[in-house]
Curated annotation (Swiss-Prot):
<keyword id="KW-0812">Transmembrane</keyword>
<protein>
    <recommendedName>
        <fullName>Photosystem I reaction center subunit IX</fullName>
    </recommendedName>
</protein>
<keyword id="KW-0793">Thylakoid</keyword>
<dbReference type="Pfam" id="PF01701">
    <property type="entry name" value="PSI_PsaJ"/>
</dbReference>
<comment type="function">
    <text>May help in the organization of the PsaE and PsaF subunits.</text>
</comment>
<feature type="transmembrane region" description="Helical">
    <location>
        <begin position="7"/>
        <end position="27"/>
    </location>
</feature>
<dbReference type="GO" id="GO:0031676">
    <property type="term" value="C:plasma membrane-derived thylakoid membrane"/>
</dbReference>
<keyword id="KW-0472">Membrane</keyword>
<dbReference type="GO" id="GO:0009522">
    <property type="term" value="C:photosystem I"/>
</dbReference>
<keyword id="KW-0603">Photosystem I</keyword>
<comment type="similarity">
    <text>Belongs to the PsaJ family.</text>
</comment>
<dbReference type="InterPro" id="IPR036062">
    <property type="entry name" value="PSI_PsaJ_sf"/>
</dbReference>
<keyword id="KW-1133">Transmembrane helix</keyword>
<dbReference type="InterPro" id="IPR002615">
    <property type="entry name" value="PSI_PsaJ"/>
</dbReference>
<keyword id="KW-0602">Photosynthesis</keyword>
<dbReference type="GO" id="GO:0015979">
    <property type="term" value="P:photosynthesis"/>
</dbReference>
């Protein structure tokens, strides 16, 4: 379990988790409000 915690706290894993989270939020936001992301 300690090795898993040290693996999950490394920088590439944290970056991938953050990017996945951000992409999910953008996809859901774009699903409900499709015109707001491309406003000039």
């Amino acid at each position: 379990m300690d090795g898993l915690k040290s693996f999950l706290s490394t920088a590439p894993v944290m970056i991938m988790a953050l990017l996945t989270f951000t992409a999910g939020i953008l996809i859901e936001f774009n699903r409900f409000y499709p015109d707001l992301l491309f406003h000039p």
